[in-house]
Amino acid sequence: RQMCIRDSFPPIGKATFGTLSDAGDPETGHCRNFEKHIFGTHIAEVEVDTELGTVDVLRYVAVHDCGQVINPMLLTGQIEGGISMGLGQALFEDMKEDPETGRLINNSFTDYLLPTSMDMPLEMKVDFLQTPDEDGPFGALGIGEATPCPVLPAIANAVYNAIGVQIRELPLTPQRVLEYLHKACLLYTSDA
């Protein structure tokens, strides 16, 4: 039996979307703030040590459509910075709080781990498409907030592809990877 998923859940909300009518000043490029959607895709290749639970990102590719690119070097740096930020969220950064007081337990750089240059992929390729945006200044679109978002699923799915176990909690710490591998091994051996 086939059924549309949309029909199996009652609606829980409604959304509306409006577009901008102000195209901006053609000489200066100035225009009002507005919402825009940008598109990109990221691919990660990882190596997972199944004895230690460590995840190393070996290669990484990111491609974004940023409208008209004004400064390619700055744009590349912005995307690489977003990859670094997302890599930290995917593999290391974990806010821990005291359950009684609600205060952060790991509130220093000693306890709250961030990626270093040693954690970054050895091979990283950044590219962009250029579809000029009619509303953006000189046809450009923003990129800053969008670059870390695809990093987390790219790394998590690469880990899934590498070990065959889907981990739906972040960060992918060695302890968490080993815990999920152990659970999967127990499930596999009990089914056999």
Language-model features: where?
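C-terminal catalytic domains of large/alpha subunits in multi-subunit enzymes
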Residues: 2, 6-190
